[in-house]
Amino acid sequence: MSLDINQIALHQLIKRDEQNLELVLRDSLLEPTTTVVEMVAELHRVYSAKNKAYGLFNEESELAQALRLQRQGEEDFLAFSRAATGRLRDELAKYPFADGGIVLFCHYRYLAVEYLLVTVLNNLSSMRVNENLDINPTHYLDINHADIVARIDLTEWETNPQSTRYLTFLKGRVGRKVADFFMDFLGASEGLNAKAQNRGLLQAVDDFTAEAQLDKAERQNVRQQVYSYCNEQLQAGEEIELESLSKELSGVSEVSFSEFTAEKGYELEESFPADRSTLRQLTKYAGSGGGLTINFDAMLLGERIFWDPATDTLTIKGTPPNLREQLQRRTSGEK
């Protein structure tokens, strides 16, 4: 992994009681040892693999103002990180759920792009076996379950300040209040809505195939083409490029897909991140609720699976063998 650490600072917040968070600040930056580089590389890998929301700094963001001064050389990185950790403590103190943790600020470069990663990591206890096969207590940073994380694309922020996507953060699973406090600390608001872009893409694909008057099999082939392209981009860590996708769909219609989306006003960005859960809808139908979970390939609708919208009834012809065996065992046992 081509990852180079420029500067990295580590501080700590310790929860002493319900009202107080103690601040423990380092007096020096961490040295980028092999262990430190491996830790940051793991953080980068874990964070990059998660679904993220996109945002931008508010005009009054204290963090953005301090970061700008630091980037201009008016404040060193350690002082910037110490002051920011103090603001984080003050923001956390407003919430009853506030916990401590290890606060990390890392300025690093990956594939010619500069980033600032800010995260609060849990320092957990565990056990280890030493060389004498004795069991001893140990501590570790819970990187895999980190949920308070934000990353600023410094290159994008400085070269394209009007962007709505230079800041990314995790949202959803950690809860609304946790997301709120971290966004307040960052002085940021949500920008590009990647899920909405992906939903818009799916709608555009359906409308595009309908206007081209394709039959069912042809429509499904186009959806599979779109899914294959988007999934390849997702696996490669690349964004969906509307023009590239349009080339993949050349021949479907006399009008190119990119021209179609522009003319119909879908408001799709030229490029945007792929959202795995939304893209699955190109090839599958899935849903759950009320104790029922259903998942099937889209091509089966109208062939083995039929939906009657009037009665909201789904009819399945031919059940999977393992399900059929379970049903047979259960029904035979009840006779």
From Swiss-Prot:
Compartmental location: Cytoplasm, Nucleoid
GO CC entries: bacterial nucleoid; cytoplasm
GO molecular function annotations of the record: double-stranded DNA binding; single-stranded RNA binding
Keyword Iron: no
InterPro entries per record: Nucleoid_associated_NdpA
Pfam family, any one: NA37
Domain of life per record: Bacteria
Keywords, alphabetical: Cytoplasm
Record-linked HAMAP family: NdpA
Family under the similarity heading: Belongs to the YejK family.
Protein name (database record): Nucleoid-associated protein YejK
Organism, as annotated: Salmonella enteritidis PT4 (strain P125109)
The encoding gene: yejK
